[in-house]
Amino acid sequence: MKQYLDLMKKVLEEGTTKDDRTGTGTLSIFGHQMRFNLQDGFPLVTTKRCHLRSIIHELLWFLNGDTNIGYLKENNVSIWDEWADENGDLGPVYGKQWRAWGAADGRQIDQLSKVVQQLKQDPNSRRIIVSAWNVGELDQMALAPCHAFFQFYVADGKLSCQLYQRSCDVFLGLPFNIASYALLVHMMAQQCDLAVGDFVWTGGDTHLYSNHIEQTHLQLSREPRALPKLIIKSKPASLFDYRFEDFEIEGYDPHPGIKAPIAI
């Protein structure tokens, strides 16, 4: 994960001091790209421990089209708690847009099902895209999509994916985002009988919060370790039938976790 550590250094060295929506303040750069060859290992940060259980459960929650934190709470995942209302609802966030995008004529479009169909029937298409940035529903969302738009690409029997993330919390959020989309590529590849290729991450406003600077320096003082391996223990009937128990990470030996406050 040298790419990730290099990004942290770049933000520290080149970032502009900016105010932000949360009132915390950031060091920010605009426009950055990283590429991870998923054949080389699962891109889970090793210079601090990442809570993989939360990453897996959140992705399964997205894939189910859910927008209430009930499932997450049942599985002791608290990453969305700060944004939910008193009933646990978040409005039409990722799961709703991925699985039931509302069209002007009243249809609900299951973008992920269409992607699976496209990858199987027309893998050379340049339109294999999922968007969470539904302009007509942004005001109803508890939090506008940060990882907003992603595209799949097939070449030489390998499935790659590029994500555009409009806003990126480099210290807390980005390790989750990288691992989550890498996991999605593995799942999608398995369903479509493809090997995994690259995960390409592209960031817009890419920032370190001012109250994460000390933690960032600590993380940069650590040597990265070998990447773990993802094992998917079974192949369910569809992309939407995976369970938490289907996944295993082998060889994950991270440095200790580093706590930092979340900006709301």
UniProtKB/Swiss-Prot annotation:
CDD domains: TS_Pyrimidine_HMase
Residues annotated to bind dUMP: R21, R126, R127, R166, S167, C168, D169, N177, H207, L208, Y209
One MF annotation (Gene Ontology) recorded for this entry: thymidylate synthase activity
Main location: cytoplasm
PANTHER family found in the cross-reference section: THYMIDYLATE SYNTHASE, THYMIDYLATE SYNTHASE 1
Function: Catalyzes the reductive methylation of 2'-deoxyuridine-5'-monophosphate (dUMP) to 2'-deoxythymidine-5'-monophosphate (dTMP) while utilizing 5,10-methylenetetrahydrofolate (mTHF) as the methyl donor and reductant in the reaction, yielding dihydrofolate (DHF) as a by-product. This enzymatic reaction provides an intracellular de novo source of dTMP, an essential precursor for DNA biosynthesis.
GO cellular component terms attached to this protein's record: cytosol
Catalyses which reaction(s): dUMP + (6R)-5,10-methylene-5,6,7,8-tetrahydrofolate = 7,8-dihydrofolate + dTMP
EC number: 2.1.1.45
Source organism of the structure: Yersinia enterocolitica serotype O:8 / biotype 1B (strain NCTC 13174 / 8081)
Quaternary organization: Homodimer.
Protein known as: Thymidylate synthase
Binding site for (6R)-5,10-methylene-5,6,7,8-tetrahydrofolate: H51, D169, A263
Keywords from the UniProt entry: Cytoplasm, Methyltransferase, Nucleotide biosynthesis, Transferase
Stated family: Belongs to the thymidylate synthase family. Bacterial-type ThyA subfamily.
GO biological process: dTMP biosynthetic process; dTTP biosynthetic process; methylation
Annotated metabolic or biological route of this protein: Pyrimidine metabolism; dTTP biosynthesis
Entry's localization field: Cytoplasm
Gene designation per UniProt: thyA
Record: active site: C146 (nucleophile)
InterPro entries (UniProt xref): Thymidate_synth/dCMP_Mease (IPR045097), Thymidate_synth/dCMP_Mease_dom (IPR023451), Thymidate_synth/dCMP_Mease_sf (IPR036926), Thymidylate_synthase (IPR000398), Thymidylate_synthase_AS (IPR020940)
